[in-house]
């Protein structure tokens, strides 16, 4: 996830480094939640992938993470383990699912616009690398608008304990009075497995008598975005009510297909 050479290419030669063929989450959260109670942790899970995004910048100055693949449209189980942002396993029905990887990507892409700048002193990533990132202690990343009018921070927590951070905000073009938060975590009690994905969290206000200092508490087994941007449109997995996929259906047999597609479809 980066080394001294990728850092050199960026810092000394001004090259923009991309993380090409970055893995998408490889799990079926409605099943894995039965094993780990969150559906988010484990090797190649969504928190692991979020850690790769953060670590690839902190350790290798990689500024783009390209998911491979973004959409999976192969037959379920016919190729390899699930790996996608959008699950489209039923080409005969048109059914698709905005999977956990989609909401993971939303945490980053909707709260950091093209051209935003990384705050190197407010980025950090660690953990043990072995085709995954495990046993982390801290993983966070901060970006700001070029004119310093907006700011977003991204956190992960794969542990079973709350991670607490004290953040001092200064030299910005806005008065740091309150931050909004968006959190993805596992279900509580008898909730549905995706009940707490991409949900608005509590407002984060300054510590008393320290108007520029904030305490941020990252829940166990979660992905968290803290931002000055508008979050009023966020509504969990119902954030995009106009997106209504076709109903799932079994493949009717015998199945025939002439494989003749228009240029637009291809």
Short names for language-model regions:
Residues 199-242:
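C-terminal beta-strand-rich structural cap/linker in extracellular carbohydrate-active enzymes
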Residues 233-266:
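Extracellular glycan-recognition regions
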Residues 1, 20-24, 67-71, 155-158, ...:
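Active-site-proximal beta-strand/loop segments in catalytic clefts of secreted hydrolases
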Residues 1-27:
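Active-site neighborhood of glycoside hydrolase catalytic domains
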Residues 170-193:
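Solvent-exposed beta-hairpin/edge-strand motifs
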Residues 121-177, 221:
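Carbohydrate-binding surface patches
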